[in-house]
Design a protein with these regions (language model features):
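Extended C-terminal subregions enriched in glycine
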Residues: 470, 490-491, 524-525, 533-582
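Short beta-strand scaffold segments in enzyme catalytic cores
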Residues: 122, 126-134, 425-430, 498-500, ...
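Short, low-complexity, Lys/Arg-enriched N-terminal segments of secretory-pathway carbohydrate enzymes
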Residues: 1-26
Length: 613
């Protein structure tokens, strides 16, 4: 499998290393970062969630001129870097590296932190995909800890009651987060297990600050805002309102106790120890069908990733299905032979044409996605080899009409439709020994299934909503994808695609991934294209307003910032357009060359990067 070189265009990352000669002190950088995060988060909330005097959403027109760069920082480091959705979690991961922890150690420590400080998106009640690269071996691995359907699940269990797949006790898959972390730690961990959890346990004493994102989500998430444990943590009884951003709150005592037991007894205790007994009691009381055997029998998979050779000798590593790594590769394969460069987006006509081609590639790739599912239940080896091959990409590219689009999903090869997925958080890590980790984790919808378990204090996922169910024909007359139907022990298809690019000498070049549900795959593709083909810095690539097309519904979703003339150009080719008002996708990317590591955390969520010089 070969894709045209994605690194032929020199970027401004490569040209500007002046900040290496006079680095800021870490404390100063953290203070500045926090101030910037608060400023941006407040501005975004006021923009995206702003209300008119009458209480109706305000919708400013699409801009005529391009937006100014965000206030996020383009960081440079000499040795190592950790990028997360929260500055404190990045610092925790960096501190683990400074203690001679491995890249996996740093990732696990940041995951536990993110599971608290971004508890609306991920946590120990969810699951993940992880790509690990070990420099000494010159080899990459995929860790698949996606949640599984309980043994008592049936293909039609949500017939006539689809909301039960999204909220409440029947929405849970068997959580894989902790067993997946434990499996990765057993193989690549270096520091004591408890030391990876202690920095997060410290928040049980000191408390943590409510982020803008957490505040936004708790105020709108159905059911979750009424949960007694979440309200005890996040609700101010004096004002009768949720605590505003910046307020210091403490985690629940139940959650702190659970985390302490995991630290003391190891990751398996949640699956076959005292915590497992308590969790099953919680779930039975709530009405879940997850059993003690479901927990005991859950296994995280350590397997080979999809490995795609680039024409210059670089290699892209990304997880196999049920992740969307194959979809990402398919997008890049389709676009590879266009030989995009910085000139491809110079001038209005070129920019419109290039975006049109990218959007068409998205549509073809999301048709491919409708046939993907859990490879433990489907033999997809031949299909994956085909859709990730250069020849398949060329054949699809030849079908793209530069002048007009189609609004028929069947035209692009869709034989069914896929469910949307939601939520997620991403972590990217580069260690000073050359190892790297790209990790995307999720509890699916904001605050998962909308409640916290009584004894164990865990926010459980609602991953069952990511499965397709028979009998729901969409507006195009397409049936849901059978590849993603529910079966006991099966993992649902996901948009997550944590990826690592390594050069021909075995050195990590790019660690990238995203949060944002169904928009994840296109966001990763867009940022990679902008960085590696258009020659932008990682900050420029992440800052740029993004667009997304998932074939169904038949519209380009775009965020504020795409200019009116570009949108008019796309509409003239027959595209429908819809502007979304939420944060969309959130990207964390680390890029390394011979000079430095260049890193940026997406301004849309207020994360940051910490590193070592």
């Amino acid at each position: 499998m070969t894709i045209r070189s994605m690194t032929v265009t020199e970027s401004r990352d490569d040209k500007d290393s002046s900040c290496l000669n006079g680095p800021y002190k870490l404390k100063t950088k953290l203070i500045i970062s926090v101030l910037i995060v608060l400023f941006i988060a407040g501005g975004l909330t006021g923009y995206f969630l702003g209300l008119t005097d009458k209480g109706k959403p305000s919708e400013p027109p699409d801009p005529v001129l391009r937006l100014r760069p965000s206030a996020s920082l383009l960081h440079t480091f000499k040795k190592a870097a950790v990028c997360t959705d929260n500055p404190a979690c990045s610092e925790i991961g960096r501190n683990i590296l400074q203690q001679n922890g491995s890249a996996v150690d740093a990732t696990i420590a940041a995951m536990f932190c993110n599971g608290l400080l971004n508890q609306q998106s991920m946590g120990i009640g969810g699951g993940f995909f992880m790509t690990v690269y070990i420099r000494e071996e010159g080899k990459a691995y995929s860790v698949i800890a996606r949640e599984t359907a309980p043994a008592g699940a049936t293909v039609d269990m949500y017939s006539g009651q689809p909301d039960k797949a999204r909220f409440g006790p029947l929405a849970h898959g068997v959580p894989g987060e902790v067993r997946g972390m434990w499996a990765a730690y057993q193989r690549w961990g270096r520091l004591p297990w408890a030391s990876l959890i202690q920095p997060t346990l410290d928040f049980c004493e000191t408390g943590f600050n409510v982020s803008q994102v957490m505040y936004d989500m708790i105020t709108v998430a159905p059911y979750a805002k009424d949960d007694p444990i979440l309200r005890r943590q996040l609700f101010d009884t004096k004002t009768n309102k949720f605590h505003p951003p910046g307020t210091t709150v403490k985690p629940s005592a139940e959650w702190c106790r659970t985390l302490k037991i995991i630290a003391e007894k190891g990751g398996d205790d949640l699956y076959n120890g005292t915590l497992a007994v308590e969790l099953i009691d919680d779930l039975k009381k709530a009405g879940s069908i997850i059993t003690a055997d479901d927990l005991k029998n859950y296994k995280a998979k350590v397997t080979d990733p999809i490995a795609v050779k680039l024409a210059n000798g670089d290699t892209l590593y990304t997880p196999p299905p049920p992740s969307s790594g194959a979809v990402l590769v398919n997008i890049l394969n389709i676009l590879s032979s266009y030989n995009f460069t910085a000139d491809s987006i110079k001038g209005l006509d070129n920019e419109v044409l290039t975006y049109h081609r990218i959007i068409e590639a998205f549509k073809y790739a999301y048709a491919v996605r409708t046939k993907l599912g859990d490879t433990d239940f489907l033999d997809l080896r031949e299909y994956i080899a085909n859709i990730t091959s250069p020849q398949f990409g060329i054949e699809v590219r030849q079908k793209i009409n530069d002048n007009v689009t189609s609004n028929d999903p069947v035209y692009y090869g869709a034989e069914g439709y896929s469910k949307d997925d939601h939520g997620t958080a991403h972590i990217s890590v580069m260690a000073d020994n050359g190892d790297a980790v790209s990790l995307t984790s999720s509890i699916n919808y904001y605050f998962g299934a909308g409640y916290v378990t009584e004894k164990t204090g865990i926010i459980l996922n609602d991953v069952m909503d990511d499965f397709s169910s028979p009998g729901f024909t969409n507006q195009f007359g397409l049936q849901p994808s059978p590849a993603n139907f529910i079966a006991p022990g099966k993992r649902p298809q996901s948009s997550m695609c944590p990826s690592i690019i390594v050069d021909k000498d075995g050195n990590v070049r790019l660690v990238i991934g995203a949060a944002g549900g169904t928009k994840i795959t296109t966001a990763v593709a867009l940022v990679a294209i902008r960085k590696l083909w258009f020659g932008e810095t990682v900050k420029e690539a992440i800052d740029h307003p993004r667009f997304h097309h998932q074939l169904i519904p038949m519209t380009i979703y775009y965020e504020f910032g795409l200019t009116q003339d570009i949108l008019d150009g796309l509409r003239s080719k027959g595209h429908n357009t819809t502007r979304y008002r939420d944060r969309g996708s959130i990207v964390c990317a680390l890029y390394k060359n011979k000079t430095a590591i260049y890193a940026n955390s997406d301004f849309r969520k207020g994360g940051d990067v910490a590193g070592m010089d």
